[in-house]
Curated annotation (Swiss-Prot):
The gene is gpmA. One of its GO terms (biological process) is glycolytic process. Gene3D superfamilies: Phosphoglycerate mutase-like. It holds the Pfam family His_Phos_1. It catalyses: (2R)-2-phosphoglycerate = (2R)-3-phosphoglycerate. Homodimer. Belongs to the phosphoglycerate mutase family. BPG-dependent PGAM subfamily. InterPro entries: His_Pase_superF_clade-1, His_PPase_superfam, PG/BPGM_mutase_AS, Phosphogly_mut1. The record marks 158 as: Transition state stabilizer. Catalyzes the interconversion of 2-phosphoglycerate and 3-phosphoglycerate. The keyword rRNA-binding does not apply. The active site is at 10 (tele-phosphohistidine intermediate), 88 (proton donor/acceptor). It comes from Mesorhizobium japonicum (strain LMG 29417 / CECT 9101 / MAFF 303099). This is 2,3-bisphosphoglycerate-dependent phosphoglycerate mutase. Its EC number is 5.4.2.11.
Amino acid sequence: MSRTLVLVRHGQSEWNLKNLFTGWRDVDLTEQGHAEAKAAGQKLKARGLKFDIAFTSALSRAQKTCQHILDAVGQSDLKTIRDQALNERDYGDLSGLNKDDARKKWGEEQVHVWRRSYDVSPPGGESLKDTGARVWPYYLHDLQPHVLRGGTVLVAAHGNSLRALIMALDGKSGEEIVKLELGTGVPVIYQLNADSTVASKEVLEG
């Protein structure tokens, strides 16, 4: 039984490039982002991975990343579930703002707290804790059963929705998880035990 879970943050988006808060806004990948997603697929192909099912968010940057990966491994038509439970953290009133402009409006310290604290949310938005409150139950109910049946499951999503998953899988604290940097288009491969605990973890960087 493989019991394999592969997490991939979407490739660079147009708003990543412009240093804007993105959240639930639906923006496209950059040329570099498409290349990162294709490269992720090639890394997974080189490992000989074949997926039983794929999950992604309701946002096109994650969906396109997912499709690039499936194309690379020769599974373009694989069943793919799209659900907003895997969407990026909702940045509320910060969405669409340049991060430097947000610092000018609210102050460097306040914006830093909103971005890098675990349980403080920006106006009208979600904290990382809030994001985890929708991501983890979705994982337990919809994703994990496929893995525990011996499947190989792809999840193409976002920096903060994946942080929320990794926090629970790795047993990290809120303080630890906010410091975790997830590269765009970098696959993280988990092997799970039959009791759902983590047997191994590998990050395919470079």
